[in-house]
Curated annotation (Swiss-Prot):
Xref: Gene3D superfamilies: 5' to 3' exonuclease, C-terminal subdomain, Nucleic acid-binding proteins
Record organism: Clostridium acetobutylicum (strain ATCC 824 / DSM 792 / JCM 1419 / IAM 19013 / LMG 5710 / NBRC 13948 / NRRL B-527 / VKM B-1787 / 2291 / W)
Official protein name in the record: Holliday junction branch migration complex subunit RuvA
Designated gene of the protein: ruvA
Compartments where found: Cytoplasm
One record GO biological process: DNA recombination
CDD domains: UBA_RuvA_C
Amino acid sequence: MYEYIKGKYIGINKDYIIVDNNGVGYKIFTSGNTMANMPKPEEDVLIYLTQIVRQDFIGLYGFLTKDELEMFNKLLTINGVGAKASLSLLSICTVNNLKYAIITGDEKTIVKAPGIGKKTAQRIILELKDKFKSTDISKGNSEINNLDVDYDEHSKKLEEVRFALNSLGYSEKETDRAINNVDKSEGIENIIKSCLRFLMN
């Protein structure tokens, strides 16, 4: 039903973002990767969408890139892999890294995602391996490994920032909002200082 939405980025919550389009705020569930790359609030953004309709739930899921949306949809075709598990995978892996893990049969990377056990990881590899080629990965193996290291270090850095802010009494929602509004390329100490300045304003 939906292809994409273009509007003003309003903010982030635990597992979704809010985009305003013509005065209507759209709640869009998304991955950690997309959340980490969102612009600053009030800036325009384009999110590629898919809608999931169940008997007890209707929700929008969206991503900054078509590649991530396509990977999300492919994961949903696998028995036992729902939207939550798919988002979990796309939060601990970039699309390139996940494709590489599937092509090479790397279960260890896939089971790092919360909600993904060994059998599910094996099923993902079995059912999707033939759908990807090495040429689908836009970076070489050495760069893939560098991406892994960079992403792991980035995630670890943000976790330390979250822990520090939570220890100071800030809620998860306040912490996520602050992190989303500061420069995350700086060192941990500077990110914490920037977050505190944001929260105190």
